[in-house]
Amino acid sequence: MAGMKTSPSQDEEACVLAIQLATSTVLPMILKSAIELDILNTISKAGPGNYLSPSDLASKLLMSNPHAPIMLERILRVLATYKVLGCKPSELSDGEVEWLYCWTPVCKFLSNNEDGASIAPLLLVHQDQVPMKSWYHLTDAILDGGTAFNKAYGMNIFDYASQDPQFNKVFNRSMAGHSTITMKKILETYNGFEGLKSIVDVGGGSGATLNMIISKYPTIKGINFDLPHVVGDSPIHPGVEHVGGDMFASVPKGDAIFLKWIFHSWSDEDCLRILKNCYEALADNKKVIVAEFIIPEVPGGSDDATKSVVHLDAVMLAYVPGGKERTEKEFEALATSAGFKSFRKVCCAFNTWIMEFSK
């Protein structure tokens, strides 16, 4: 553009980044294949510090395609570039160099842990053909109004999932894996459940989150609150009572009310309705415990935590009418508007922030 002067080195760097952005679909699709081929789990099982060659990997994965090692090498190179894998050279007997690949901390979270949980299903759901189609409608949604997913399917993502058993399975698996990993970290980091006699998990689904809380704090009575058809199919958990209802109508009473990743699916008006019902369900000096992502006040941050949350905000923009990630000030404003006397940001667990709204 006229008037914009850059040095040759700045131009070089900027153009290289532009090309990387232009081909940025490569990384998620390579990761999708790596997960579907069980590459990451196989490398993780080898253990930290143990390296595998592409040929080793093809053999362990029982691949019959004679070209598989060469193709795997190209996939592994991409993953190593983004620190999903580590790599080192190994000199062969003929003097040629072969590259070997190993586990990294990022690979740890994209592989099954001791609980069988992983972030991998979260990646698979976002690369699934169903939600991918919605991105082709984002431009129209911005120009004409509405939500990209609704334009693609005529309904929101939650209603669609209830009508598509295969996608529903993929969706639920992604939520379960992410939730298990995050809740485990929350329970290691946050001590605000100590001393509670009862806790209500609003929008608690099958009760898995509440079961994790009660397993650590067995004297707490847990109330898992969700829509009747959701809790009707939920498994029995010791110390957990399933209660069906509508959070927009009322919320069961408890010492504390827990809401994890609920508010980012709703508009400010809907969040306020939910919070006012929570306020009515609490005695004085009791609290709502909120677990949500917090988006920075100032745009332009380049750290991984910021990139992660702005990605999730874009996901909510495309998939969920009214859904969005919020700043700390926006959460505090919601708490104040609902009548709570204090707001406190307590701690962070894998980019999910714990906040307390006290009555």
From Swiss-Prot:
Q: What induces it?
A: Induced by methyl jasmonate (MeJA).
Q: What is the effect of changing residue 175 to A?
A: Altered substrate binding
What changing residue 315 to Q does, per the record, is: Abolished catalytic activity
* UniProt effect for mutating residue 122 to F: Slightly reduced catalytic activity
Q: What is the effect of changing residue 315 to F?
A: Strongly reduced catalytic activity
What would changing residue 265 to I do, according to UniProt? Increased catalytic activity
According to the record, mutating residue 265 to H results in: Abolished catalytic activity
Documented effect of changing residue 171 to A: Altered substrate binding
Where along this sequence does the record place binding of S-adenosyl-L-homocysteine? 179, 203, 226, 246, 260
Q: Where is this site: Determines the catalytic selectivity of hydroxyl groups in esculetin?
A: 126
Q: Spell out the protein name for this chain.
A: Bergaptol O-methyltransferase
The upper taxonomy is: Eukaryota, Viridiplantae, Streptophyta, Embryophyta, Tracheophyta
Gene that specifies this protein: BMT
